[in-house]
Amino acid sequence: MSVRPPGNPTGRPVAISRRGRAIAVAVVVLIILIQVLPRLNTAYTDWLWFGSVDATSVFRTELLTRLGLFVLVGLLTGIAVSAGAVLAYRFRPVFLAQAGLPDAVARYRAAMGGSPAKTLIWIPIVLGVLAGSIAQTGWQTVLAFFNATPFGRTDPQFGLDISFYAFQLPMWRAVVTWVMVAVVLAFLANLVTHYLVGGLRPGAREGALTRAARIQLVTLAGIFVLAKAAAYWLDRYELLFRENATFTGASYTDVNALMPAKIFMFAVALVCAIAFFSAIVIKDLRIPALATVLLLFSALVVGSAWPLAVEQFSVNPNRAEKEREYIARNIEATRAAYDIGDDRVTYIENWGAPSPNPRQAASDTTTLSNVRILDPNVLSPTFTQMQQLRNFYGFPETLSLDRYTIDGEMQDFLVAARELDPSALQANQRDWINRHTVYTHGNGFVAAPANRVNEIADDAGSDRGGLPNFQVSDLDTINNDQEMMIPVTQPRIYFGELIAQSDPDYAIVGDNGEGPREYDTDTTQYTYTGSGGVPIGGWINRTAYALKFAERNILLSGLINDNSKIIYDRDPRDRVQKVAPWLTTDTTTYPAVIDGRIKWIVDGYTTLKTYPYAELSSLEAMTADSTDELGGRVQVDEEVSYIRNSVKATVDAYDGTVDLYAFDESDPVLQTWMKAMPGIVQPESEISEELRDHFRYPEDLFKVQRELLARYQVDDPGQFFTNDAFWSVPSDPTVTSSIQNPQSTPTGGPLGGPAGGSTGGTGGTQTVDREGPSQPPYYVITSDPADPESDEPTFQLISAFRGYEREFLSAHMSASSDPDTYGEITVRVQRPIEPLAQGPNQAQDIMIASPAIAEDRRLWGETAEVTEGNLLALPLANDSVLYVEPIYTQRKDQDSAYPRLLRVMVSYDRAVGYAPTLYEALRQVGIETDPNLVRIDESGEAEAEAEESSGRPGAETSSPRPSTPSGTGGASDAQRGAAIDEINSALNAVRSAQSSGDLGDLGQALDDLQAAVDAYQALGNGN
């Protein structure tokens, strides 16, 4: 017996009053306005912004594609759902018994009987809006599908062009997925409606389903199974970029078991769909029920159990041989997808002299004369303190490196734009007028030669010396007609990374009729005259931006008139990504002076994650290194299996103009997007020579290729499977070492071995894997890797490789940034001789284990903070690798303190040099060169006088060391091993003494360590 709800004895639907309806309608309209108006305002301001950068076509193409997808998918989804419900209602039973029904069902039936359209209309609308909202996010997939460009390269399994996987397969997968979802929604709508109108009567004696219900439900189920069959067919192709334990791509099991299983499941699904459709004419639901069981059973046995059995009983016992063919496919595809094939990478096998020769190393004058001693990751505070000018100017935490031709010679510089730093404004400078109409721009371009300081610094307690030799181009130098090494005609900076860090980052500029208002210098104001920015004089635009930034002053301020503009989105990287949303940009942008104007250069990548057999990798993980801790940008968390630096972009620092240039016109992904959005990317021929001279090989691409080359330099699939020929990217020794903590000691032995352990005389072939972030690559000027005897300097991005889970040096990678050889990668594979060449961490260990360095560290640590600069691994001639590391000090407990270069450490063939000058440090390891060639100061004094300065603080007292002679005069491996053991023992003693705090014991331990090092070096001298 049913019970009617209290207060409604009739059981009829409760009528809503006219006032109640009006209130309900008003609430709905208000909700819609709250949701829709901000989106309409955003769309309008975006349209204005794109117009200000001449990229309206991008906005229009994206908007129309999104709207088209929203309407099409939303409409089709709504039609599918409503059709399922309407058909069920249309073919409802004529005579419907109400007795015995739950009250809720009875009320719904009564409501639908009176006005079914009003009852049913909201469900399809809501579901259609949701489906359309989800579908419009795939607008890039649709555009790529309709503008696909062939790769001219096929996959090894199906022989299809790579473009099918890149552009077509994602679209077909999206269509099949939508069909399955739409059919499920229609099925549920049909099922529920049939239940409510009586077409589905569970427990009824005369049958649970009416004929109409049976036909409609089995038809929808059959369509779903057909879509599932299509999904099985597409699954075969997606196996080609499936991740396996060893590699990406279809494995032996995938090709020989899972692919046939997918075909079998495709056939079974077709049969099952026919079985479902047969129930339209055959009144027997056991047929589709059996079909469902068959499909599930086949999926379990054929789709899962069979491939698992093949994996366990056929592949696992002989996996290396079984997977050989498929690993070879992965190697070939990965090299092609990441542009690290033989056409791009040159391997120099057995690089390095059997016995390092300092004289031969000294012949590489191009590299030695350009050794970089200024670290862009350390010296930002120095730039800020010495070149800030005003409290509201600033520099990024990490400076940039670029090169300029000065007096006909290439010179690398630390460079930075002096930007406005809104976070540094004082309280009286932070009101709305000052923040957005007065303090609007930065001033100047600051550079410093990377291999020079103003003068040599001897004392950590002194303020003299060790500072960059600044070359400034700003308003003062222009107004005073001062000579500029790097001339700039427009030094004002309205767009940059630092100024964009404020929230919101907009400025309102233009002639307000009352004269210049913007701060320029202490004695002058300025009015922006650039082409960039959105006109904001009209009330419509003012209202739109007042809503966008939630700022009423934009509406009320009398400083805004018909000449006013608003500039925002001032981060160069964000501007490029907004104009080209299909690009992934490099995390590093850098300023360059091009034709007298400061321009930000941004590297843009085209990427895919569906390249068959190519290694699928995380961009964020592969580009992470120790510089992330400095607050730098982190790459997007996106997985890719293909990458190209296809676009070089510039953003004018004054007016924000965005220019995109095709840099790899052969890239099919770039070609696809140039067809989808014509006119946005300029052809490569439009790149000026001056701009091309400042292009750098991008860091993020280099890091990705470096990580992959560590494994994919292996040609043999068998070696690839066993990992025994892999390399590794070393951890950053300047982060993992302890030079910044005077009370601690190195974490490894003097040659990178475990503390207190023997390396067996092999030069450090231990299996300890260093913890810590990866060492970043470094920009340097060196001799040509392909022709080290040439005097022509080249601008290279370099990195070392260590052995797999070893610390010795395995190889050295460099990528050229020179216009004529841009992108050519050279890998010097270290000659496998004993003792093995030092890796970066081993070189770091042996340098900071030097007694002279340890003593200086102890003394300086009382009053100053000691910071290590970047450890550069520089191949010299065809000889060996020279490690160079600058040391900086900064006074403690002073807000205005800043780092200064105090010492230079070098390591060559396990010998250590340590001095205030590079020349002295090189002499200590036996590399004699022209003192004027490697002079690092600008005092004008030749460093030949430095030969008498061995008594300077911090200078090593050892004499120049020639190379180890060959033959009987050299030390045996056993002698070397014993000497290394002595050094390790001495290091342990130093650690113990430091832990105890006994200065007497520490002094004795340091003396013992010095004696052990001297004994080891004596073996190298053949004594």
Question: Can you say where each PLM-predicted feature lies in the sequence?
Answer:
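Soluble extracytoplasmic regions of secretory-pathway and membrane proteins
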Residues: V3-G20, A26-G51, T56-S996, G1000-N1021
